Structures are given as structure tokens and as C-alpha cells.
């Protein structure tokens, strides 16, 4: 006989309280990553060479009371405020950097806080879907310990973007279901806020996923409900998109505006590059059921940073089984299958060249032409499957409280679990027989796969055999998933960080990041790992996102780089030959410079650099016959990131080449008269001068930055304050919980039917 569990007749047990589950989620996450805080584990790859140095530099600039706009230390100068992955215009990144400072511990704490923010968001979103406490816990745990977080743990901007995903969908879903405008505003503000310091690929993809999610909500809702009506749905999504565009505008408008003539990234990438660069291969789908697939791929790859390493997709055995069970259950079929097919669609984008989907997306959605790495789309598959698992947890909790489940449901769960167990064990077996090198953790990976998958099958079979054990199913799944994901984290942690090799080297300095002074005008050649950002030392070429392929080629050739480094890097010539900015020009310029031991002066009109006027024809004879440039006496008066002034002594009228990078927002005066800055020698600043002493003053003045930033932050503040006030009012008006009733004996289900 089934017995009803009278939960209303007693106080909620401690383990069924939401705050306890939340604390447990945070504690497990911190315990799994505690080595990052103690220094036993450190960032590596892009984390060590890009994100940590730039966070430290940004913190130093902010603490000095300035904005990071122009970075004079990297690549002979760079407009780094436009690079969203640095977060120079994000209130979150700036606030944390200002408070925590430029230390390595501060960077790792920021990293972990962002990472954990995603797990907490998934927990809260699962609650909005009606999940029980244990379902929320599983959702948060499986998301924050998923292979996507591990595979991209080195990429701080990716972690930043994806951790906002559940919060964005939470508020967007609320807006779609209620027709209220406030949640739509909040969803747009969250996506825009994430974009200010996030990865552009994830930002754009999140917008696509939000659109697909909204469509599923619309088509799976009855026409009598608000979510099923066309006009409210369109208004909600339009408001969401408008707020997003306003909030992210300081970074994204500036990126599109400032990078023209400076970086190759100002325009779309080629279709071939987008589709073929770091897409997941079909064999990578095995990572859905086994976390060690990327580890074995890494052990057998020539490059440890190969695309296979970034294909980690595992998020737990139990959540996957629950998701498949959700599809097999009656009720809300359009909603569940809609989410499933959206997940499959984004998984198809992940496969890159294996399917035509990513290419079609390139053709149909222009913003997707600006980023590569198709494997990043897999996070939306993970998210969709976890949503299905959340829905199944709600059903199981309902049956648990009733004391019984509909006939055949538990048998289905047992069959699903057994099938997935067979698949999971087959995958690890195939790994062992296929790959010659199995990696350092195979002795843990094999028992992990066997115990987890057979354990899941045994739990499901036991509940199917004895339905009375249904009351213990949530606890068993929670214990299994905690052990499963902690072991998976152990197997894959070295994809995200180094363990046990000590702190990476830092070229610390007492130099100011904003007051360079004449003594720091000298420029070095190349510094590995962006160490110049720790040392505040200008370099000609460094690792950065705002790439210019010709500039990188010039660094490899060496000749042009030699003329733009050292202390005496200001040149004069009576003539500057007009030439196009092409690889052919670079090759001839390098050849002439090597032969003459001095540069030839080339000029590039502003309109040509901006693509407003056609480039001049390449004239090799004119370049060959041009006079050699010469060094002239100069005195640096002011040298700051956004300001450079100097006196230059010129023998006659002509042109002065200052070997700091050209960018369209630099303004100049020569002897007090405003003078347009032309491009010189492909990358640098060229100014007309007169015979005698010339006072040259240059300032970096980004176009529309301050109006856009003021509007963005003001809108963020208004939406945030309004949301906070509403939350406070709801909490103040919430009725007190009812007094606990006296406990009563269990009542047979039949007596109440």
C-alpha cells in the first residue's frame, strides 16, 4: 500500500531547504577549486598569457584614477578599451579590479566568483521552473561543473559571458510568461552587462539562443495565455534587444568604429575560417557521456591546445538520464521537445565542417560572421538538456510526495539508465583500445565510468523493482552526481589550470601605468606572455586580440620593427610616397629598409585606411627611388597613454614619422595648428612639418565614447535600482509562514481518493 507523505504537517527538513542546498553548492565548488586560492593551482595558456596580465594592468590603471583607453605598452599602442574581453568599460570588472587590486590572487578570486555566479544562476532558474530543492541543486552543480566550464576555464571572457546565461533566460522567461516589461528590461540589461566584459561569440550566440528559447515558449503555450500571443511576445523580445543594444553600445560601437584601419578584426571573417576553425568533430560527441575524452585527445595531440581539448561537454550521468526521461514522460510535449531540438540545433552548429549548419548560420545571420570557434555553441546544448533534467526532477518529486509513480514510468527510467550506462562504458572501452596513449588519469577514468554508469543503472533498476524506494531516489541521485562531477573535475582540471608547478613569472615594476614620462619612450622588441603589462614597458609586438596580420608579419621580418624600437624611433624625410597597405608593400618596404639600413617613408591617406576611398596603385619604382628617412633630434615633453607631445628639429619642410600605431581617434596639432594624422609605413603616424623646431601634440579622443558610456551605465543603474526596490517590496509584503501543525499519522492514499 502506498502512503502519502504529509509534508505539510511538519516542518521542512534541513536538507530540503533551498538555502542549505545553495550553501552546499557553493561549498562543493570552492572545495573543488580551492587550489586556485592557495596558489597550488594557477592559470595557464590564455589565462596566463592574456587574461591575467590584462586584469593586472586594468587594475593598476583604475587604481591610479584613470580609464584604460589607449594602451601604449602592447603592439606599439592599442585602443584596448574597445576589446570587450578586457572589460575596460564594464562596471563589474572595473569595480572588482579597483577593490581587489592587480595581484594574482585577485585575478583568481575574480575568476572563481564569475564561475560560481553561473552555477548560482542555474540554481535560481531551476527554481523558477518549479524544480524541487534537489533538482535545483543538481542543475546548478551540473552546469558549473560541466565540461564547457572546464574546457574554457582558461578563457575568462567566456566564463564571464556564459555565467550570465541562466540569469538572462530567467528574466526573459518571466517576461514571456507574464507579459511584464520590467523582466524584459532586466534580461536585456544582463545581456548587455555581460557583453561589456565577455566573449563576443558567446554574446552574439546568447542573443540567438534567447530568440530560439522565446520561439519555443511561444509555440508551446496556449493562445489564451500571454506567452502564446504574438504581440506581447514580439514586444518583449524587441524591448530585450533594445536594452541589450544600448548597454553594450560603448564597447561594440567603439570596437566597430576604432578598429577600422587598425585591426583585421574590424571586418567579417571568411566563411571557411569561421566554419573550420576549432569546430567539434563527430567523435567529440563522445565527451557527452565521458569527461576524459578531451584528456585522451590531449595526450595524443601534437598541440595540447588542439580543438579536441576544447570539446569537453560532460555534465553528469544523472542529469542526462533525467533529461531523456523528461522526453519520455507525458505532458508539455511541445515545450520539452522544443527545448530538445533547440539544443540539438546548437550542437549541430558546434560540429563546424561536419554539418552545413554553421555555414548556413554564417550566410543568414551577419553578426555570426565575426567570430570563429564553433565548439562554443555546445554550451547551449548543455543548458537545454539541463532544463529537461529540471523538468523531470519536478515530476519525480511530485510522485515521491504521492508515494507512487504512474505505471511504467520507473521501468522507462531503468531502461534509459541501462542504455546510457552501456553507451558510457562502451565509450571508455573504445578509448582504451583506440588511442595509443591514454594519458595520466586513465586509472581513475575507467573506474569512474564504470562506477557512475553502473551506479546510475542500479539506482534506476532498484527503484523500478521496488517502487517504495522512490522516496530515496532524489538522495541517491544527488550523492551519485556529487561524486560523479567531482571526479570529472579532477580528470579534466588541467584543461583549465596548471596544478603544482608554482606561480607564473611576473615582471613586477614600480613604474606608473599612466605616467610613462620621456624616459619610457624607448620601446622593446617582443616580450613573451604579455609581461610588458606587468613591467609597464612598451613593446612592438605582443599577444593580443586586436590582431593585424601585417603588423605581426613585420615583427617576424624584423626590419621595420628595428626602426620602431629603441630610444631614437622618430624619423624625417622630405618626401613620403603614397602606397597601399598590402603585403606586397610590406615586402618591398622590408627589402629596401634592410638594404639601406634606414626606412623609406610611405604615406597612407586617412580615407584609404578607413576604406572610404580606393587605395592608390602599388608603385614599386616610386618606392625604390624615394629618399631614405633619417633620424632627427627630438625631445619628448609628455608621454602618457592618451597623450604624447614632443619637439622635433627638422632640417627642411617634409614629413615626420612617429612610430606609435595609427588609430582614427588620435588628434594632433603641429605648432598649434590642427593637423590630420596620416598613416605612415603601414602602421604608424605621419605628420607634415616645417623646417626648424616643430611642437607636435597628440591626444586620443574616442568618438562618442562618453555619451554612450553615460547612457549605458545610467540605464543599467536605473534598471538595477528599480529591480532592487521591487524585490524589497515583495519581501516586505510577503506574508509570514504559517505556524507548524501538529503531526498526524500517515494517511493511506486510498482514503483520500
Residue positions per predicted region:
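Contiguous transmembrane helix-bundle modules in multi-pass membrane proteins
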Residues: 3-6, 156-163, 175-188, 192, ...
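Active-site-proximal, structured, solvent-exposed surfaces of multi-pass membrane proteins
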Residues: 14, 348, 614-742
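Transmembrane signal-anchor helices characteristic of membrane glycosylation enzymes that use polyprenol
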Residues: 17-48, 53, 240-257, 345-348, ...
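Membrane-interface coil-to-helix junctions
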Residues: 19, 28-122, 141-163, 260, ...
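Periplasmic/ER-lumenal interhelical loops and adjacent helix-loop junctions
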Residues: 51-62, 66-67, 91, 246-327, ...
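Transmembrane helix irregularities
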Residues: 99, 145, 149, 153, ...
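Transmembrane-helix signature of polytopic, membrane-embedded enzymes
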Residues: 123-144, 181-182
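Soluble catalytic regions of membrane-associated enzymes that act on cell-envelope
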Residues: 292-293, 300-307, 311, 322, ...
Amino acid at each position: 500500500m502506498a502512503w502519502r507523505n504529509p509534508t505539510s504537517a511538519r516542518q521542512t527538513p534541513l536538507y530540503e531547504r533551498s538555502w542549505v542546498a545553495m550553501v552546499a553548492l557553493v561549498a562543493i565548488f570552492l572545495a573543488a577549486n580551492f587550489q586556485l586560492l592557495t596558489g597550488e593551482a594557477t592559470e595557464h595558456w590564455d589565462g596566463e598569457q592574456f587574461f591575467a596580465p590584462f586584469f593586472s594592468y586594468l587594475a593598476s590603471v583604475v587604481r591610479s584614477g584613470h580609464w584604460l583607453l589607449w594602451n601604449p605598452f602592447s603592439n606599439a599602442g592599442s585602443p584596448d578599451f574597445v576589446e570587450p574581453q578586457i572589460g575596460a568599460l564594464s562596471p563589474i570588472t572595473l569595480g572588482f579590479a579597483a577593490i581587489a587590486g592587480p595581484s594574482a590572487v585577485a585575478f583568481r578570486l575574480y575568476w572563481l566568483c564569475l564561475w560560481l555566479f553561473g552555477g548560482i544562476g542555474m540554481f535560481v532558474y531551476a527554481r523558477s521552473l518549479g524544480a524541487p530543492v534537489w533538482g535545483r541543486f543538481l542543475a546548478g552543480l551540473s552546469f558549473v561543473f560541466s565540461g564547457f566550464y572546464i574546457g574554457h576555464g582558461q578563457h575568462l571572457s567566456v566564463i564571464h559571458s556564459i555565467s550570465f546565461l541562466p540569469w538572462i533566460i530567467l528574466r526573459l522567461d518571466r517576461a514571456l510568461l507574464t507579459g511584464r516589461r520590467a523582466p524584459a528590461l532586466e534580461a536585456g540589461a544582463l545581456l548587455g552587462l555581460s557583453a561589456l566584459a565577455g566573449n563576443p561569440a558567446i554574446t552574439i550566440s546568447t542573443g540567438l539562443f534567447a530568440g530560439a528559447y522565446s520561439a519555443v515558449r511561444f509555440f508551446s503555450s496556449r493562445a489564451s495565455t500571454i506567452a502564446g500571443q504574438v504581440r506581447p511576445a514580439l514586444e518583449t523580445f524587441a524591448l530585450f534587444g533594445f536594452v541589450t543594444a544600448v548597454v553594450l553600445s560603448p564597447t561594440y560601437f567603439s570596437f566597430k568604429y576604432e578598429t577600422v584601419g587598425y585591426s583585421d578584426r574590424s571586418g567579417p571573417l571568411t566563411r571557411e575560417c569561421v566554419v573550420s576553425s576549432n569546430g567539434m568533430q563527430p567523435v567529440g560527441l563522445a565527451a557527452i557521456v565521458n569527461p576524459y575524452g578531451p584528456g585522451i585527445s590531449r595526450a595524443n595531440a601534437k598541440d595540447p591546445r588542439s580543438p579536441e581539448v576544447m570539446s569537453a561537454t560532460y555534465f553528469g550521468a544523472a542529469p542526462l538520464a533525467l533529461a531523456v526521461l523528461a522526453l519520455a514522460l507525458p505532458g508539455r510535449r511541445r515545450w520539452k521537445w522544443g527545448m530538445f531540438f533547440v539544443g540539438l540545433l546548437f550542437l549541430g552548429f558546434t560540429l563546424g565542417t561536419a554539418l552545413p549548419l554553421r555555414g548556413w548560420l554564417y550566410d543568414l545571420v551577419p553578426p555570426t560572421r565575426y567570430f570563429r570557434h564553433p565548439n562554443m555553441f555546445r554550451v547551449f546544448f548543455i543548458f537545454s538538456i539541463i532544463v529537461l533534467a529540471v523538468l523531470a526532477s519536478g515530476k519525480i518529486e511530485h510522485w515521491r510526495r504521492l508515494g507512487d509513480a504512474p505505471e511504467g514510468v520507473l521501468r522507462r527510467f531503468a531502461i534509459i539508465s541501462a542504455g546510457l550506462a552501456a553507451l558510457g562504458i562502451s565509450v571508455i572501452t573504445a578509448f582504451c583500445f583506440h588511442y595509443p596513449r591514454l594519458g595520466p588519469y586513465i586509472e581513475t577514468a575507467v573506474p569512474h565510468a564504470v562506477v557512475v554508469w553502473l551506479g546510475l543503472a542500479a539506482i534506476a533498476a532498484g527503484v523500478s523493482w521496488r517502487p517504495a524506494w522512490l522516496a530515496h531516489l532524489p538522495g541517491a541521485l544527488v550523492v551519485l552526481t556529487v561524486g560523479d562531477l567531482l571526479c570529472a573535475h579532477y580528470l579534466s582540471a588541467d584543461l583549465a589550470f596548471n596544478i603544482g608547478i608554482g606561480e607564473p613569472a611576473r615582471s613586477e615594476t614600480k613604474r606608473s601605468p599612466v605616467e610613462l614620462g620621456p624616459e619610457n619612450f624607448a620601446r622593446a622588441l617582443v616580450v613573451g606572455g604579455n609581461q610588458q603589462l606587468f613591467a609597464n614597458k612598451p613593446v612592438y609586438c605582443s599577444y593580443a586580440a586586436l590582431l593585424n596580420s601585417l603588423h605581426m608579419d613585420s615583427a617576424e621580418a624584423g626590419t621595420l620593427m628595428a626602426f620602431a624600437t629603441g630610444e631614437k624611433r622618430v624619423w624625417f624625410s622630405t618626401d613620403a610616397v603614397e602606397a597601399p597597405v598590402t603585403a606586397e608593400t610590406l615586402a618591398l618596404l622590408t627589402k629596401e629598409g634592410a638594404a639601406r639600413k634606414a626606412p623609406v617613408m610611405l604615406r597612407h591617406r586617412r580615407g584609404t585606411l578607413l576604406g572610404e576611398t580606393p587605395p592608390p596603385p602599388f608603385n614599386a619604382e616610386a618606392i625604390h627611388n624615394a629618399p631614405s628617412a633619417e633620424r632627427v633630434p627630438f625631445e619628448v615633453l609628455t608621454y602618457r597613454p592618451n597623450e604624447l607631445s614632443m619637439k622635433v628639429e627638422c632640417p627642411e619642410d617634409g614629413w615626420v614619422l612617429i612610430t606609435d600605431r595609427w588609430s582614427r581617434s588620435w588628434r594632433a596639432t603641429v605648432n598649434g595648428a590642427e593637423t590630420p594624422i596620416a598613416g605612415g609605413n603601414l602602421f604608424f603616424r605621419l605628420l607634415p612639418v616645417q623646417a626648424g623646431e616643430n611642437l607636435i601634440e597628440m591626444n586620443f579622443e574616442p568618438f562618442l565614447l562618453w555619451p554612450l558610456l553615460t547612457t549605458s551605465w545610467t540605464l543599467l543603474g536605473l534598471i538595477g535600482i528599480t529591480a532592487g526596490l521591487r524585490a524589497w517590496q515583495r519581501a516586505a509584503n510577503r506574508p509570514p509562514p504559517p505556524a507548524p501543525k501538529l503531526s498526524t499519522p500517515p494517511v493511506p492514499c486510498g482514503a483520500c481518493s
